[in-house]
Amino acid sequence: MAELQMLLEEEIPGGRRALFDSYTNLERVADYCENNYIQSADKQRALEETKAYTTQSLASVAYLINTLANNVLQMLDIQASQLRRMESSINHISQTVDIHKEKVARREIGILTTNKNTSRTHKIIAPANLERPVRYIRKPIDYTILDDIGHGVKWLLRFKVSTQNMKMGGLPRTTPPTQKPPSPPMSGKGTLGRHSPYRTLEPVRPPVVPNDYVPSPTRNMAPSQQSPVRTASVNQRNRTYSSSGSSGGSHPSSRSSSRENSGSGSVGVPIAVPTPSPPSVFPAPAGSAGTPPLPATSASAPAPLVPATVPSSTAPNAAAGGAPNLADGFTSPTPPVVSSTPPTGHPVQFYSMNRPASRHTPPTIGGSLPYRRPPSITSQTSLQNQMNGGPFYSQNPVSDTPPPPPPVEEPVFDESPPPPPPPEDYEEEEAAVVEYSDPYAEEDPPWAPRSYLEKVVAIYDYTKDKEDELSFQEGAIIYVIKKNDDGWYEGVMNGVTGLFPGNYVESIMHYSE
């Protein structure tokens, strides 16, 4: 500030005065030089003196101008710096004023609001009462809890047909069914094993019959005696019987048990009927009233003699009596018709009513069991099919030859866990078995195509939506002749050809015993 004041008050005004003085001096010097040149005799000397004065005058004027210009520029720089300082101060003052205005505005806005009561507490608060730790209790693992979840192996049920009609016909062709039949009950195991109540009957070798023995179909009408070595009740063996089977149907032999079967096919609905335990002594028949029974300790006692021929009136009675006895749960056999009485003092004895006989002997209705249905036409015409199936049980004219003793128990090899061994009087138990027609063990029906891709069984009910489709129930047998890329199959069922969704059926699986 002092420097600027000195410049403004001393140096700059001094420089200006020096310039004015130089101006006056230059005029006097010019007059002197002019007069000297005119008056001097030595013109050359006067000229040189004039040149010297001129040079000195120019130099002094230039110095004075330079000094004054420097002082002015220095004054301008000082003033510019002062202006910048003043500008900064003004900006600071303006910002301070703005801040003050903001504070005042916020204060005015805060007046219009209400106070909020905030409680100053910790974010995490420890519970007042600590929970007591729960003692660990080990629970046994339930391996069957997930058996009904997921897409596991679909086991085909052989002797059970669902009575609920799940109409899946409205589903799109590419979408699998969203419902499936209820899962079968588990019998104490994690998965369906070989001892499941729905599995196929175990293959059992048929009893051996002597060559000189001729089966008698009317022996079912004779008194019988239970073998003394029998220790297992018939009810202890899981057996399933079909009401649609005929007396000439195939027996569940090793061929029928080698298939994985489910449902009843298109033959009929199978009905599970438990085999009742035979009573120790049957009521005395009308034809042998007053006759004492045979002793129970005689395992090889001779059979009671029966007439060689049966009256013709017994055939319709036996055929007509089959249905009510079946419905009654096998209450008791029909009283036998005999012409000779058993020996005195012996109890009734049980014998097998099913014997493997000659394959060329035609079956007769009169010799059927009292609780069996009369043989159907298909069972009589499918005699040749029995060559590939189990032992054929036929009814022949009566014979007086006594039956052989029960065969010795033969071992049956099976996978683990093995089934319980059959009792020694197994063929006596076979006498109470109702024959059924196995749609999987028999040969293909007449309406089956000569060549087909595979044989499938329906696992859901389906109602057709179009004319070229098939409608079927669960358990129906279909022969697939073509598989389309869109998931639909073309097959034959009961002689009718049509389309059906491939996800509603499943191939009949085979397994080796």
Swiss-Prot record:
Signal peptide interval: none
Intracellular or extracellular location(s): Cytoplasm; Nucleus
CC annotations in GO: actin-based cell projection; adherens junction; cytoplasm; cytoskeleton; cytosol; dendritic spine; filopodium tip; lamellipodium
Compositionally biased region (Low complexity): 242-272, 283-325
Region annotation Disordered: where it falls in the sequence: 167-431
Entry-linked InterPro entries: ABI, Abi2_SH3, Abl-interactor_HHR_dom, SH3-like_dom_sf, SH3_domain, T_SNARE_dom
Source superkingdom: Eukaryota
Domain notes: The SH3 domain is critical for binding to ABL1 and ABL2.
Example of a GO biological process term: cytoskeleton organization
Gene: ABI2
Chief place of localization: cytoplasm
Modified residues (Phosphoserine): 40, 183, 227, 368
Domain SH3, residue spans: 451-510
Post-translational modification: Phosphorylated by ABL1.
Disease field: There is evidence, including phenotypic data from ABI2-knockout mice, that loss-of-function variants in ABI2 may play a role in autosomal recessive intellectual disability.
Name this protein carries in UniProt: Abl interactor 2
Species whose genome carries this gene: Homo sapiens
